[in-house]
């Protein structure tokens, strides 16, 4: 279960404070996937970023005893001067047990299908290559909840099919928190 209590999130704008949420209370049940659907700017992605710990509310709290992924396929957090392998190793050190480190790196290397680019700096990657690496990294770890903000597959038809297969496998044991318009 994920419980949100009295959560407020706002941003400063030239015309004053814009509230995305004000005293939001919601409970997301365990074992259920939830889709947040709404117009652009409604706060769907902001809510998922806060649930995933990427953004913080102004006030209130998010309570859970479940593991929650970062947004699936998120490629914006990579360090450009490090190689794909080095970036994956950094994340794996945070989320994996020491004895799983090699396995996680090998999984992402195989999944992303970047070949020699896996050992090149990420700043040399195309956006599609970054997305493949990000998606592979997301699938390397098992979470109770996966955050899915719009894009769930990248690349050609075969790679999209591969991504869909992994999504189905993860959905057997995990729940998804999804955003769509």
What are these regions (language model features)?
Residues 24, 167:
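Class I S-adenosylmethionine-dependent transferase superfamily signal
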Residues 169-180:
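Conserved catalytic loops of ABC-family nucleotide-binding domains
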Residues 10-15, 67, 72-158, 164-165:
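ABC-family P-loop ATPase nucleotide-binding domains
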Residues 2, 20-23:
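Conserved structural motif at the start of ABC-family nucleotide-binding domains
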Residues 30, 64-66, 141-142, 171-173:
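Short loop/turn elements that form and flank the Walker-type P-loop nucleotide-binding site
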Residues 9, 25-28:
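Conserved A-loop
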Residues 30-35, 39-93:
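ABC ATPase nucleotide-binding domain signature region
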Residues 2-16, 62:
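Conserved beta1/A-loop at the N-terminus of ABC ATPase nucleotide-binding domains
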């Amino acid at each position: 279960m994920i419980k949100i209590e009295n959560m407020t999130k706002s941003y400063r704008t030239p015309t004053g404070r814009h509230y995305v949420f004000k005293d939001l209370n919601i409970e997301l049940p365990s074992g259920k996937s939830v889709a947040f659907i709404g117009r652009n700017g409604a706060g769907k992605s902001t809510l998922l970023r806060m649930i995933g710990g990427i953004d913080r509310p102004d006030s209130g709290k998010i309570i859970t005893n479940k593991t929650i992924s970062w947004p699936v396929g998120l490629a914006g957090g990579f360090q450009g001067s490090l190689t794909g392998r080095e970036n994956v190793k950094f994340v794996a050190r945070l989320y994996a047990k020491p004895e799983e480190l090699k396995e996680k790196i090998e999984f992402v290397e195989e999944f992303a299908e970047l070949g020699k680019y896996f050992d090149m700096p990420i700043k040399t990657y195309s956006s599609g290559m970054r997305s493949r690496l990000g998606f592979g990294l997301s699938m390397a770890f098992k979470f109770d909840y996966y955050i899915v903000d719009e894009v769930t597959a990248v690349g050609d038809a075969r790679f999209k099919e591969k991504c869909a297969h992994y999504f189905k496998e993860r959905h057997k044991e995990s729940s998804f928190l999804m955003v769509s318009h």
